Amino acid sequence: MKKYVDVILPLPLPKYFTYSLPDECAEEVEIGCRVIVPFGRKKFYTAIVRNVHYCAPTEYEVKDISALLDASPILLSTQFKFWEWLADYYLCTQGDVYKAALPSGLKLESETIVEYNPDFEADAPLSEREQRILDLLSVDSQQCVTKLEKESGMKNILTVIKSLLDREAIFVKEELRRTYKPKTEARVRLAGSADEKRLHILFDILSRAPKQLALLMKYVECSGILGRETPKEVSKKELLQRAGVSPSILNGLVEKKIFEIYFHEVGRLNQEVKEVVELNALNEFQQRAHDEIVQSFQEKNVCLLHGVTSSGKTEVYIHLIEETIRQGKQVLYLLPEIALTTQITERLQRVFGSRLGIYHSKFPDAERVEIWRKQLGEKGYDIILGVRSSVFLPFRDLGLVIVDEEHENTYKQQDPAPRYHARNAAIVLAAMYGAKTLLGTATPSIETWQNARNGKYGFVQLKERYKEIQLPEIIPVDIKELHRKRRMVGQFSPLLIQYMKEALEQKEQVILFQNRRGFAPMIECRTCGWVPKCKNCDVSLTYHKGINQLTCHYCGYTYQLPKSCPACEGTELVNRGFGTEKIEDDIKVLFPEAAVARMDLDTTRTRAAYEKIIADFEQGKTDILIGTQMVSKGLDFDHVSIVGILNADTMLNYPDFRSYERAFQLMAQVAGRAGRKNKRGRVVLQTKSIDHPIIHQVIGNNYEEMVDGQLAERQMFHYPPYYRLVYVYLKNHNEALLDQMAAVMADKLRTVFGNRVLGPDKPPVARIQTLFIKKIVLKIEQNAPMGRARELLQRIQKEMLEDERYKSLVVYYDVDPM
């Protein structure tokens, strides 16, 4: 009897598609395996098998699958359940979830672009088909799969591509900016035997070459070669630094056959783990918090740990992790920002060693695929540390989920679908496994705070800072008055300059916070007021001095800064506003001797860049760190005594009902970076709104007063946590047609939802990538059945798209928008 499979395609399709199984693989296919399938006229995709059955569909002609890619499933049953929940709750398709969930190396398709890996060395003979593909790529190193299929004359080419990808002979489009070459480190060892007698002979030989002798002696010291059975491995970089000699001295010893240099792989998955240490004992306050969390988990599945900045929440997490993995269960530890993984990784590896796996988008795709496959086996990592995409990984027996800095809006995926919130998704995922979830932060989101206070979540507080470090002193500075008196130096108040100077003189560090990247948010012609706008989007372009270009932060469009105004030919083009790049420039003028680094999206596009900025600041190589909100997110530095918040008003004046909450969180978090064990930190908060209630609440660290004020307003105006929000976005290239379609859809929604519907209106940015945008807001009572609301929304969307006039309408939803 003929077998069929229902598959999920990596496309926004509302249903599964059915394919027939050829007899040769009919018994091998399992739910969760990948298959290559034809779709459309000439395209092939990697699909995931959802069901295996014997029922042929009647509405379309069934095609055979082209190939089976897996001998065993790459998706577990709980993951399918999780995908279904995400698609249903966030009003998207399982195809959308599939595209977001899997590393690109696991979802090849006809349009995938592949590139030859120049570092590839075959460890086994290539098949004739594999060699043919590599021959074609050696002529043109970047080609799409469709073109390779045409030129090679092969059928089922995706199986060959998969094989070459597994062998790392090629890499796929998403990874073209990264290298697959394993990260290696040059190390030094003695050539030949290393006994005491030979060392004495070498010392005699080098007696007339003092620098070479000093290098050899330093190697003996670093490696511990005389006191150990197995000498410690010594890196070339460390040896040269500690001996204080140039590479030519080492090269001389290599030529004399005394030393040899070899390369050791230090990639993430093969990273040499230092000796594992015992857990640190918790102090009295941490222990009490730990015990209260454990007690809370007896009754509730979710617990909020509200701990002030620098209270030692991570140490509490580590003890809970250790107890969970001792029970044979796995832990998922979520962070809002890739930058944070660098610091936390070191702390966790010291305790858990190779039981820890790290997963995020800055890793090459091959490494992410490797972690995914490892998690499917019996010997998966006990702990996964990662950012929001880590919720998609397979787990055999998840016991605990930790969501650190749970209030951060970076946990929310903005584009494309699924527009999920990783914190909320993680809570649901944990429930599916019967696991517990711990939410940790110094400044909880108002929704989480409300859930904790009304008893839905457990609630534990940790009010004392670790080792009695004092909370910083926050000093507000009225820059409106200083600007009026012309006492500002660029963007810096005299007080901030004085404090920075004192800190640098005392060898302390400074963090400056400005939540806008680039050099200037806007360029303006002083003569006629012309402002350069993006040709694709309804926004002004940001000037980036480093590349001397104007850039759109929405679509990436760039063009050179004109020498004169194209409207009036005036030559006075002036900067309006300031970003991190401008601050960096100004600081280098004010403090030319200081080592300055900038941490924003432009300077941290690679994993290595993140790590270097953080490591240099930790080691005291950087004196002043300038950054966007990245610097506010839980990073711990011992020598920061001054934090400058350069312009609080940009946060307070943002047109969003959450702006006051976010402003408080950002300012409180960045302020928490200041302070040392024996010295109280200082925060200079520059603002033109010196009497604003939020400014006073930040100064007094009065979180609860801020929350009470915001809750009263939100209840009055029907916002979360009292109401749920769904934003309905409509897009089209034709603005007039879009206006008409948006009005019709809003009317249809009002017939069902009544006055819960607001709009349609233009969002703050009303055109992106040549598409005009309209937004309809839906406010639904917290206790209303959301499942029914979702059904009605999808029914109305279907009605719209079935109307011939509205075929070109693009509709998508943002559920629980941030």
Which residues does each PLM region occupy?
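Accessory, non-ATPase domains that flank or precede helicase/AAA+ motor cores in DNA-metabolism machines
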Residues: 1-384, 390-441, 453-469, 752, ...
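Short amphipathic alpha-helical segments
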Residues: 15, 235, 724-726, 772-774
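Solvent-exposed, membrane-proximal periplasmic/extracellular interface segments of envelope transport
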Residues: 39, 56-62, 66-72, 644, ...
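Glycine-centered secondary-structure boundary/capping sites
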Residues: 91, 103, 153, 168, ...
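Inter-lobe coupling/hinge segments of SF2-like helicase ATPases
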Residues: 277-283, 287-290, 299-739, 747, ...
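Short secondary-structure junctions
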Residues: 591-594, 749-757, 802-807
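A carboxyl-terminal module marker
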Residues: 747, 751-772, 811
